[in-house]
Structures are given as structure tokens and as C-alpha cells.
Amino acid sequence: MIIKQEELEKICLNLYPYFFDYKDITLHDINIKIDDYLHVKANLNYYNIETKIKAIARVVVKDQIIINFDGIVKYGFINLDLKKVLTELIKDNPYLQIEPDCIKIANDYIKEITLEDGLVKIELK
């Protein structure tokens, strides 16, 4: 399966409400660039305050899908560490596990994920 950057942006916009079911935190737009890494820029409305997220991530598939990432959340004029913010938001989500250096997602179906030239290539088991 091959997913283009634009398609991945649409998927994120559509899946956001399922993973982050907060009425006062809405995702307005997202921009994703793919090379050897995923580069993400997103704009949210977080309790009526414009919030910007910048992140870079690398995806590895083992027994789980492991997303190593780093980034910042600009909340008004305050810069926050993305890992700390996600740890708080995701702590009760049974599908995602946050560790100090990565997010882990249960994996029963994906054999490999490759990032290159604006594409995400997914090989199923």
C-alpha cells in the first residue's frame, strides 16, 4: 500500500476525532512532508487559544509500530515539549502507549513501513 503526503494529511484530519475526543481541542489543518522522516506542522484550537505543533518522527515496525519523535507545541507565546503534552493527552488511550522516547502502537497487521520521496509505503503481513 502506498500513501501520498496529501492522503496522509486527510487521514490524520479524519482520524483525529477518534484518538483525541476533546470538544475544546480541534485540529484545523495539518501539513506533512515525507523524506526519510515525517515532518509535521499542525494548527489546533486548544480551548480557544491558537496552538501550533511542529514535529519530526521516524517510524519503525517490530512487534509494535514504534514512532520516535521530537517536537514543540507553541501554546500562545509559551513553548511546550511535545512529548510531555502527548503523555498527558494519551495516558488513558488504550491503543497508544507513550514512553519517554517514543509512541508504541499494537501491531498485528503491518510488516514494514518505509518513508521516501513524499510517500509512505506499507507492507502488510
Say what each PLM segment does.
Residues 1-125:
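Extracellular/lumenal and peripheral-membrane lipid-interaction modules
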